Amino acid sequence: MLKKQWNCTKSYLNADLALYGEELNADSDLRCKIAREAATLLYFGAEKEYKQAKLKAANTLGVHFLPSNFEVALELDKIAEETEGPARKERLIQMRKEALKMMKKLKKYGPILIGSVWRGTIRQGSDIDIALYHDVPDEILNVLKSDVKISKTEWTTVTKRGKPETSFHIYVETAGKQMAELVVRSSEEAGCKRKCEIFGDELKGLNVQELERLLKENPAQKFIPV
């Protein structure tokens, strides 16, 4: 009798687990659909911010939960690869070479390649992002003037973890017709660890030596956490 009751209980448990597994798979599939929709909105310019793209995608699909920025970023990378094809890889390598030229010119300011050119996740409209560390931005502007076209400069302040962070942004066009944004932070911030708001890992980037080695050994390598 006890054995029969246990077999019945076991059957119910297995049925419940199977149903739970189906629900998890359904949720996972739906998260992928929302992430894909949000990534599509970002790629084709319908939205510029991840949060707004996710909210709009969830509303379109009639759901009340959102995927992570990381999930959207992975879908965005897939869309870029599907849409742009082999030319994307060649453009990435060219952008990394252009970045290296600027970084060598600005080597004394501790340049670090960051953003999508570092990650290897560029898409149409991506620019080169380089972080610099110095207390006198005008000095960097003077170094740049002979090699690039400076289109805009501005101071920006953002609040992170309750503290204001100020940086000087320089927008340029390189000799190779690539657009770049140079972010100048204070010298005391050099070496400070920063967390990526999209991928959730540490924003390590590449210095001059690391970028040179990358271009020799694996020029199209991606840096995406697994």
What are these regions (language model features)?
Residues L2, W6-C8, L17-E47, K51-Q124, ...:
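Catalytic core of pol beta-like nucleotidyltransferases
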